[in-house]
Design a protein with these regions (language model features):
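C-terminal motif of bacterial Sec signal peptides marking the signal peptidase cleavage site
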Residues: 4-7
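Interaction-mediating elements
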Residues: 9-307, 316, 327
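Gram-negative/organellar outer-membrane beta-barrel architecture
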Residues: 157, 274, 294-417
Length: 417
């Protein structure tokens, strides 16, 4: 009976004139398109239509049913409130559907896929107290890429973008697709970030589309937007590298004495507590003074700092150097975890040999044992197990021991390509 109600009685709760919205159906009217491609495109279009109808399981809408049978709860707790607000789902009405808006969304979507002459019409069908939307797409011909140009200007940035054409995702003969163009912009941005362009972003790349070349083809021209700010046009190098290994997140200011500052190679270490040996940062931080900024080195340095297991918070900033406008100062603000910790554990256990017992362990750890981010742990444990049945009932097993380990941080050196 409950299954029948969940599947069939939801519409009886609707007000006069209300219709339950049960979804969208899309039809692609193009005999030249393969059946498989038509079906795939129809599924994509149906997924874009809004709002979504009430969820279904095996053809039924149990969440809507739970919402309806709960009624309006009189208080903000209890079974009715839980059913209606936690389990239930408010009915999606056909009056919430904007057919014209959805048609425009679907039309824009297929245009972005290269169907520049696409037209979408919308209609609806009513069945009793239910209704669904119908969208018909006449896609027209799909435009394909004829040629791709990366014109270089005289600037270093323009030349860097032009050199990115060797691995472009925009291929002559491929269908026009806005998503591929967006991915290409991100690819170029990623390439530039590895070559010093810290302030660049994909929005500064313009892909001009010329659809007037005929034969349902387009020409693409990839270039830098004229309004790209000056900072984004600079390939930065690394100047000062400053590390604060004992940074407190509880304060916005950093106070230190001259004797707290230690110069270690290219790194300036400011550590009033002398928590760490400066040489540990040689293996972790990938930048050196004079290096061209590289996003891969940036991310790898942060990843290694986090994976050390020594710091609770890791924060990194790059700022334009006061001494050179084409260089960046790198700052690393590191908040250590408590150096020492003590943990107690009590375990209860049983096994198939009818032994039952418990174990107590005391674990002590030091996350910076020799001031080189080494992890020293020692555990003292003891326990007893008693056989509660069987031939050796009452037989006791005692266990006591100690485990000690010392782990040094190790990093695999990346292969530069």
């Amino acid at each position: 009976a409950l299954v029948f109600l969940a599947g069939c009685s939801n519409t009886k709760y609707l007000e006069e004139g209300e219709l339950l919205y049960i979804g969208a159906k899309a039809k692609v009217a193009d005999s030249a398109m393969s059946r498989k491609d038509r079906k795939a495109l129809e599924d994509e279009l149906e997924g874009l239509a809004r709002p979504k109808p009430n969820s279904k399981i095996l053809g039924m809408r149990p969440k809507l049913w739970a919402y309806n049978i709960a009624g309006e709860p009189k208080k903000e707790r209890g079974l009715r409130h839980w059913l209606r607000n936690k389990v239930g789902e408010e009915p999606v009405l056909f009056s919430q559907v904007d057919l014209e808006y959805n048609a425009n969304v679907l039309e824009s979507y297929v245009e972005n896929r290269g169907y520049f002459k696409a037209k979408v019409s919308a209609d609806s069908t009513r069945r009793g107290k239910k209704a669904f939307a119908e969208y018909t797409l006449k896609p027209g011909p799909r435009y394909h890429i004829r040629e791709v140009e990366f014109p270089a200007d005289s600037s270093a940035l323009g030349e860097a973008v032009a050199r990115a054409n060797r691995r472009t995702l925009l291929k002559p003969g491929a269908p026009y697709d806005l998503e591929v163009i967006k991915t290409e912009r991100e690819r170029i941005d990623s390439r530039l970030k590895r070559r010093g362009y810290y302030y660049f972003n994909p929005d500064y790349i313009l892909v001009q589309v010329d659809s007037t070349v005929g034969k349902n083809q387009v020409d693409l021209k990839v270039k830098i937007k004229a309004e790209t700010p000056a900072q984004a046009r600079i390939a930065y190098t690394i100047a000062d590298i400053v590390v604060y290994p004992n940074f407190s997140i509880k304060t916005d200011t950093i106070n230190y004495k001259p004797e707290d500052v230690k110069q270690h190679g290219d790194f300036t270490i400011i550590d009033s507590s002398k928590l760490f040996k400066p040489r540990i940062f040689d293996r972790i931080l990938q930048f050196q003074r004079g290096d061209v900024y590289n996003r891969n080195d940036h991310n790898l340095s942060l990843q290694r700092l986090i994976n050390m297991g020594t710091f609770q918070f890791v924060k990194n900033e790059f700022r334009i150097s006061d001494s050179l406008s084409t260089a960046l100062d790198a700052f690393y603000y590191l908040t250590p975890l408590p150096r020492k910790s003590l943990r107690f554990e009590v375990l209860g256990k049983t096994n198939s040999a009818n032994f039952t017992g418990s174990e107590l362990s005391i674990n002590w750890s030091n996350r910076n044992f020799f001031r080189g981010a080494e992890l020293f742990t020692t555990s003292l444990f003891g326990g007893i197990e008693v056989q509660v049945s069987g031939r050796n009932k009452g037989f006791n097993v005692y266990r006591i021991g100690n485990e000690t380990s010392l782990t040094w941080p190790r990093f695999i050196t990346p292969i530069r390509i």
